[in-house]
Amino acid sequence: MNIALLGYGRMGQTIEEISKNRDHKIVFKLDDDIENHDLNDFEIDVAIDFSVPKAAFKNITTCFKHAIPVVSGTTGWLDDYAKAREICKKEDSAFIYASNFSLGVNVFFELNQKLAGMMQGLEDYSVDIEEIHHLQKLDSPSGTAITLAQQILEQNSKLKGWQLDEADEDEIPIHAKREENVPGTHTVTYESSIDKIEITHTAKSRQGFALGAVVAAEYLKDKTGIFTMKDVLSDLFKN
């Protein structure tokens, strides 16, 4: 499979390493404005986008207009997500966006959703989310933490939203910390006066995120439509 890397920072370099180990070719690396390049010159099967928030929408939609499917893990641009989906459909392309491509995190999402459903009737428990990342992470809270909060909100009609740090009783507080050399740790805590229930996912390196993105690209090749990591996991578990 021929892969384009949209963004060639640490994550892009890790994706390159894993892609080559899985016998794929990196045929294009973007580290400037995508409009400086003619994507038709490169025989791209799938593009993997880990760029920056201000460039993500243009990178993604430019690929759609060249009939190139896109796997995107860039966070912080989701105000334009609905528009990107519409352009994908219009151009008959394919798209997977995920706040986190780690296969382990996506299992964690499934656990979070199930736990939220179990806890929604237990009014003595309050819930909060903590995320810790490296100092270079630009967005706060993380996209993964927001996804966790959204899953809880879907299961609990008494909660109305989330807030960074301080929150009202009907909101989920998300505590975001930035520390040296932390790839990503997320904890969801339910606490009462009697006990505390926690689920935690701790990333040990970028390898898990990068592997998941490559697996998603393998899934997306030759498809059209909008997909999620649930589709990718279902395909993996089926096999």
Curated annotation (Swiss-Prot):
<dbReference type="GO" id="GO:0005829">
    <property type="term" value="C:cytosol"/>
</dbReference>
<keyword id="KW-0220">Diaminopimelate biosynthesis</keyword>
<protein>
    <recommendedName>
        <fullName>4-hydroxy-tetrahydrodipicolinate reductase</fullName>
        <ecNumber>1.17.1.8</ecNumber>
    </recommendedName>
</protein>
<comment type="pathway">
    <text>Amino-acid biosynthesis; L-lysine biosynthesis via DAP pathway; (S)-tetrahydrodipicolinate from L-aspartate: step 4/4.</text>
</comment>
<dbReference type="InterPro" id="IPR022663">
    <property type="entry name" value="DapB_C"/>
</dbReference>
<dbReference type="GO" id="GO:0019877">
    <property type="term" value="P:diaminopimelate biosynthetic process"/>
</dbReference>
<dbReference type="Pfam" id="PF01113">
    <property type="entry name" value="DapB_N"/>
</dbReference>
<dbReference type="InterPro" id="IPR000846">
    <property type="entry name" value="DapB_N"/>
</dbReference>
<dbReference type="GO" id="GO:0008839">
    <property type="term" value="F:4-hydroxy-tetrahydrodipicolinate reductase"/>
</dbReference>
<keyword id="KW-0963">Cytoplasm</keyword>
<feature type="binding site">
    <location>
        <begin position="143"/>
        <end position="144"/>
    </location>
    <ligand>
        <name>(S)-2,3,4,5-tetrahydrodipicolinate</name>
    </ligand>
</feature>
<dbReference type="GO" id="GO:0051287">
    <property type="term" value="F:NAD binding"/>
</dbReference>
<feature type="binding site">
    <location>
        <begin position="73"/>
        <end position="75"/>
    </location>
    <ligand>
        <name>NAD(+)</name>
    </ligand>
</feature>
<dbReference type="InterPro" id="IPR023940">
    <property type="entry name" value="DHDPR_bac"/>
</dbReference>
<feature type="binding site">
    <location>
        <position position="134"/>
    </location>
    <ligand>
        <name>(S)-2,3,4,5-tetrahydrodipicolinate</name>
    </ligand>
</feature>
<keyword id="KW-0457">Lysine biosynthesis</keyword>
<feature type="active site" description="Proton donor/acceptor">
    <location>
        <position position="133"/>
    </location>
</feature>
<feature type="binding site">
    <location>
        <begin position="98"/>
        <end position="101"/>
    </location>
    <ligand>
        <name>NAD(+)</name>
    </ligand>
</feature>
<dbReference type="Pfam" id="PF05173">
    <property type="entry name" value="DapB_C"/>
</dbReference>
<keyword id="KW-0521">NADP</keyword>
<dbReference type="GO" id="GO:0009089">
    <property type="term" value="P:lysine biosynthetic process via diaminopimelate"/>
</dbReference>
<comment type="function">
    <text>Catalyzes the conversion of 4-hydroxy-tetrahydrodipicolinate (HTPA) to tetrahydrodipicolinate.</text>
</comment>
<feature type="active site" description="Proton donor">
    <location>
        <position position="137"/>
    </location>
</feature>
<dbReference type="GO" id="GO:0016726">
    <property type="term" value="F:oxidoreductase activity, acting on CH or CH2 groups, NAD or NADP as acceptor"/>
</dbReference>
<dbReference type="InterPro" id="IPR022664">
    <property type="entry name" value="DapB_N_CS"/>
</dbReference>
<keyword id="KW-0560">Oxidoreductase</keyword>
<dbReference type="InterPro" id="IPR036291">
    <property type="entry name" value="NAD(P)-bd_dom_sf"/>
</dbReference>
<feature type="binding site">
    <location>
        <position position="32"/>
    </location>
    <ligand>
        <name>NAD(+)</name>
    </ligand>
</feature>
<dbReference type="GO" id="GO:0050661">
    <property type="term" value="F:NADP binding"/>
</dbReference>
<keyword id="KW-0028">Amino-acid biosynthesis</keyword>
<comment type="similarity">
    <text>Belongs to the DapB family.</text>
</comment>
<keyword id="KW-0520">NAD</keyword>
